[in-house]
A protein has these predicted regions:
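Glycine-centered short loops/turns at secondary-structure junctions
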Residues: 58-61, 134, 160
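Short glycine/serine/threonine-rich phosphate/pyrophosphate-binding segments
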Residues: 145-152
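Active-site-proximal loop->helix
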Residues: 173-186
Length: 211
């Protein structure tokens, strides 16, 4: 494709705003434990998210987690998704697989939303949480880049929030899909930025952002 065909795409969307939220997508044991059939290599991703989590807490910006778990009734609700990805049945409600990795353990005032599909917005109160905090942007982290991260970034934009994706704080089991998703997000939906840019933005909010 010619450069002219890309003209008007890939403009920077404003980055981290004055009232961001940090969302940590699916850092539950089912995706981080090597014993799980759904595991990704996420150690470096978790280390990057940890830095963002510490910075977000210092700045007192909202932190929201998602996990994925399926009870018996959910297997009917999410039937089409489970048929496409049968390994999702590993994520049984009440099992250790659906608990957040202890390296990123949530605090009592940090909601953990359960989702049945890819986007953090679909079938959850995430949009209401962002509205209640008067957020203007969402720092999207976690896994997988080509699945739930991308879906959440797209839905953030569609709900009126600027999505920002720190490159080092997302991961995928497929490097090609990871790179393609980041390219796509940066071209059309949000800002893909270095981790340090997000850390600097959050440090600049210390003392200014009350929940």
């Amino acid at each position: 494709m010619s450069g002219q065909q890309f003209e008007g795409f890939g403009q920077k969307g404003g980055g981290v705003g004055r009232r961001p939220a940090l969302v940590i997508i699916d850092m539950n044991n089912g995706f981080t434990d090597p014993a799980s059939p759904l595991v990704c290599d996420l150690d470096d991703t978790i280390a990057a998210i940890r830095k963002l989590l510490d910075a977000a807490r210092r700045a007192e910006v909202p932190v929201v987690y998602t996990t994925v778990s399926y009870g018996e009734g959910d297997k009917v609700t999410a039937k089409a998704f489970i048929e496409k990805v049968p390994a999702l049945l590993t994520l049984a409600a009440g099992s250790s697989w659906v608990e957040i990795d202890e390296r990123l353990a949530p605090r009592p005032n940090e909601p953990v939303l359960n989702k049945l599909y890819a986007s953090a917005f679909f079938g959850t109160p995430f949009a209401s949480l962002l509205a209640s905090h008067q957020c203007d942007s969402v720092i999207v982290t976690g896994a997988s880049t080509s699945g739930c991260v991308r879906a959440t970034a797209v839905d953030a934009l569609q709900h009126g929030y600027r999505p920002v994706v720190p490159r080092e704080a997302v991961g995928d089991r497929n490097p090609a899909a990871h790179d393609a998703a980041l390219y796509d997000i940066d071209l059309k939906y949000g800002d893909v930025v270095p981790l340090d840019d997000c850390l600097t933005a959050l440090e600049g909010l210390v003392g200014t952002h009350a929940r």
